[in-house]
Swiss-Prot record:
Keywords from the named record: Flavoprotein, FMN, Oxidoreductase
One Gene Ontology term from the biological process aspect of the record: glycerol catabolic process
Keyword Flavoprotein: yes
GO cellular component: glycerol-3-phosphate dehydrogenase (FAD) complex
Catalysed conversion reaction: a quinone + sn-glycerol 3-phosphate = dihydroxyacetone phosphate + a quinol
Name of this protein: Probable anaerobic glycerol-3-phosphate dehydrogenase subunit B
Broad enzyme group: oxidoreductase
Any matching Pfam family: FAD_binding_2
GO molecular-function terms, A-Z: glycerol-3-phosphate dehydrogenase (quinone) activity
Source organism phylogeny: Archaea, Methanobacteriati, Methanobacteriota, Stenosarchaea group, Halobacteria
Length: 427
C-alpha cells in the first residue's frame, strides 16, 4: 500500500524545503523525501538572487531590476520578477535571523578568501562586516583552523580596494582543540563558555578569546572571526565578545562545511516540522509510474525494498549535475526518475569548452519547463500534468557564474509548491 500525501516534494535542498513550506502554507498535506543531507550544510549561508549577469557583467547592483533583461529561458524569466519578490519575502518570513530585506540592492559581503561577494540576504552574524562599511577592521584567525588565513584575507580585501583599513591576526584558540577540529566543536565550546586556563589563569572561554585578541583589536572599530561563533546562541556569543573588545563583532562566511549553512538548514527543517510537513531522509527515489494523466506513484528504495509513494501533485527538486538530479553517461544527459527531457547536443565534446574558464554548455543543462514549471516533452507540451520542477534541476542558467543558485531555488521552489497546492484546491 502506497504512502499517500497531497503534495510530494522530492529533494531536501533549498528548493525542496521552500516548495514543501509553500505547499504546506497554502494548506496542502505535504511530504518531503530526500536522499542525502541538505546541501545547505555545505553552503556559505549567503542567499544570492543575482550577483552577475550571464555575460559576466557585475557585480549587479539591483538584482530585481536586472531580471527582465535575462534570457527568456532563465528560470527567473519563467516565474517572473513579481514571483521572485514574493518568494524572497516568503524566505524572509521563515528566516528571521537574515538581513538584507530592507533594500533591493545587493550587499557586499567579505568572504574567508578575501573576496567580496554580492548577495541579497545574509545572516545577522555577518551584518557588521559589510564591505560598504568604512569602519577599520581586524580579521582574526585561529592557529588550529587552517581554512581561514586572516592575513591572506585582509591582504586580498585591501588589494580589492575596500573603503576601510583591514588587518589580520592569528591567535591560539583557548582550550585544548586539535588542528582540523570540526567547526561545530568551536561553536559548541563558545556556546558552553567553559572555564579554560590561559597563561595559568582560569577564565570563561569567551573572555579568554577576547583577551587574546584585545591588543591587536585596540584600534579596530569591528572585528571579524571565522563563522564558528556559536550554534545554539550565536548572537549571545557575538555580544559577549563585542562587550569584551569594545568593538562590533561579525562572522566571515566560510567554505564547506559551513556553520551558517548548518544553522539555516536546522532552522528551515524546524519550520517544516512546525508546518506539519512529513519528512523522510536517507532513502532515494529511484523510479516512477506514469500514465497519460500524469505521475501516479514514485518508489523510494529502503533497505532493499521499493516503497510506493503516491500524491496528487509532485515537485522535483533533486538538484543538478553535482547533486545527481541530472546524470549523464558517454552518450546522453538525462533526468533519472521521470526521464524528463534534457536538451543537449548529441556530440559530447560540445558539452564543454576547451578553455577551463570558458562558457561550458553543461553548466546550463537541466529540465526546461512551461510557465507553471511543468517539465516539457519533446513537443514542448507538459510531460506530466501533476509534476513541477524547481531549483538546480532546471536548465537555462549558470548558477555558479551568476551567483543565482539560492535565489532560483527559493523563487522556483516557492512557485512550484504554491502551484501544486493550488492545483489540488482547484480540483
Amino acid at each position: 500500500m502506497a504512502i499517500e500525501s497531497e503534495v510530494l516534494v522530492i529533494g531536501g535542498g533549498l528548493a525542496g524545503i521552500t516548495s514543501a513550506l509553500a505547499a504546506a502554507d497554502a494548506g496542502a498535506d505535504t511530504r518531503l523525501v530526500s536522499y542525502k543531507q541538505s546541501t545547505l550544510r555545505n553552503a556559505s549561508g549567503l542567499v544570492d538572487v543575482l550577483g552577475y549577469t550571464p555575460s559576466g557583467d557585475g557585480p549587479v547592483v539591483d538584482p530585481f531590476d536586472a531580471i527582465p533583461s535575462l534570457p527568456d529561458a532563465h528560470p527567473y524569466r519563467t516565474v517572473g520578477v513579481d514571483t521572485v519578490r514574493d518568494a524572497m519575502a516568503f524566505f524572509d518570513a521563515h528566516a528571521p535571523r537574515y538581513q538584507g530585506h530592507h533594500t533591493d540592492a545587493n550587499a557586499l559581503v567579505p568572504t574567508h578568501g578575501g573576496t567580496v561577494k554580492p548577495t541579497a540576504r545574509y545572516p545577522a552574524s555577518a551584518a557588521a562586516g559589510l564591505a560598504s562599511d568604512d569602519r577599520d577592521t581586524l580579521l582574526v584567525g585561529f592557529e588550529t583552523l587552517p581554512d581561514f588565513n586572516a592575513d591572506h584575507a585582509a591582504a586580498h580585501l585591501e588589494s580589492a580596494g575596500v573603503p576601510f583599513d583591514v588587518r589580520g591576526v592569528t591567535v591560539p584558540f583557548p582550550g585544548d582543540l586539535r588542528a582540523g577540529a570540526k567547526v561545530t566543536r568551536y561553536a559548541g565550546l563558545l556556546d558552553a563558555n567553559p572555564q579554560v586556563s590561559v597563561d595559568g589563569t582560569e577564565r570563561p572561554l569567551r573572555l579568554a578569546l577576547a583577551t587574546r585578541v584585545a591588543d591587536a583589536a585596540a584600534d579596530a572599530d569591528r572585528v571579524g572571526f571565522p563563522a564558528v561563533l556559536g550554534d545554539d546562541d550565536p548572537a549571545g556569543v557575538r555580544d559577549a565578545l563585542a562587550d569584551h573588545l569594545g568593538a562590533a563583532v561579525f562572522e566571515v562566511p566560510m567554505g564547506p562545511p559551513s556553520l551558517p549553512g548548518l544553522r539555516l538548514s536546522d532552522h528551515l527543517f524546524g519550520a517544516l516540522e512546525a508546518a506539519g510537513v512529513r519528512i523522510e531522509t536517507g532513502n532515494p527515489v529511484v523510479d516512477a509510474d506514469t500514465t497519460a494523466g500524469g505521475v501516479e506513484t514514485v518508489y523510494v528504495e529502503k533497505n532493499g525494498a521499493r516503497i510506493p509513494n503516491s500524491a496528487d501533485e509532485y515537485v522535483l527538486a533533486t538538484g543538478g549535475l553535482v547533486g545527481k538530479g541530472i546524470d549523464s553517461d558517454r552518450d546522453a544527459v538525462y533526468e533519472p526518475i521521470f526521464d524528463c527531457r534534457i536538451a543537449h547536443s548529441d556530440d559530447r565534446y560540445a558539452w564543454f569548452d576547451d578553455d577551463a574558464f570558458g562558457d561550458h554548455a553543461f553548466a546550463q543543462f537541466g529540465v526546461r519547463t512551461d510557465d507553471t514549471l511543468r517539465p516539457r516533452d519533446d513537443d514542448g507540451a507538459a510531460a506530466h500534468a501533476n509534476l513541477r520542477a524547481a531549483g538546480a534541476v532546471l536548465g537555462g542558467y549558470n548558477f555558479a557564474a551568476e551567483h543565482s543558485g539560492s535565489g532560483v531555488s527559493i523563487a522556483t521552489g516557492y512557485a512550484a509548491g504554491t502551484a501544486a497546492a493550488e492545483a489540488i484546491h482547484d480540483e
